[in-house]
Amino acid sequence: MTSDGRPNRYECGPAPENQPPPDTTGMDRRAALRVGVTAAVAAGSVALGFALRDRGANKKTRALPTIKDHRAEKPAGATDMAIVRGPDPAANVRKAIEALGGMGRFVRRGERVVIKPNIGWNRLPEQAANTNPDVVAEVVRLVVAAGAGKVWLTDASVNTPEQCFARSGIEKAAKAAGATVVRPDASAFREVNVSGKLLRTGDVLFPFVEADRVINVPIVKQHGLSLASMSLKNWYGVLGGQRVKLHQNIHLSIVDLAAMVKPTLTILDATRILLANGPTGGSLADVKQMDTVAAGSDEVALDAFGATLLGLNPNDVGFIVEGMKAGLGTPQWKNLKTVELGG
């Protein structure tokens, strides 16, 4: 509730009653990906793979690495955001990046780049629970063509990673385009400082520690707790361990992770969007064909645009509001220098 007794627009609560139980295929293996933390926390809960901030303690932070700021300097007069509509997902990606000034604006020759799609679920592309594989493959091709010295592609899947990476079509498409695919086994994580309002440390996939550039490639979909899952929410997939504890304050934890990563570029996949029963989906009746890709470096602006595709007011999406407050971007995407093509 707000101070004047009105309901908080984005207060976390239980998922809607008509929300189906999550697909738990492979969750035993997922639970096995707890890295670095073995002690029980908070009322006997299991190890999480990250540490919540202890507001009552004044302990020194351990000497852990911090993920560097991956943002690229914006050239004078450059376009902030590109929105492209058309039937060919790969062409939409190319046109969006061209409108921003080309991949060379974001990736320099020899740099190490990690690409982060959503590969959380054991779903087919048509079910719109994961990023479209054609979108992902084109991003990889553009990064390779820009001269990147190393291109990783990774995500910490919720369902069994082997199934998610294969059934989504992303692993095959990314490898064919030139990426090194990193599955989230226990050896793939490194503990880092998060230094957020809620999160203190976390076990993250190692490419995010080693990369020079980070490219976020999320899908637009409804989410039962956070209302939507898009750019900012996609950073849950860098963490090892069980992430359910973060749902108790989902909007702040989303912003903590986004502030930790600070990506170079975000390419928002709205080829197909999931309108209901997210984030897992499953029914084609919940999927809408949008044939849209948006790209830019302001994740808050991109998520505000994505929210409108889901029929949401960006001001009602907590992580968009909190992201703006944290200085991660603006929800006023129409005020940015934006190019719209097609449609």
Each predicted region: which residue ranges?
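N-terminal and secondary-structure boundary signal
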Residues: 2-343
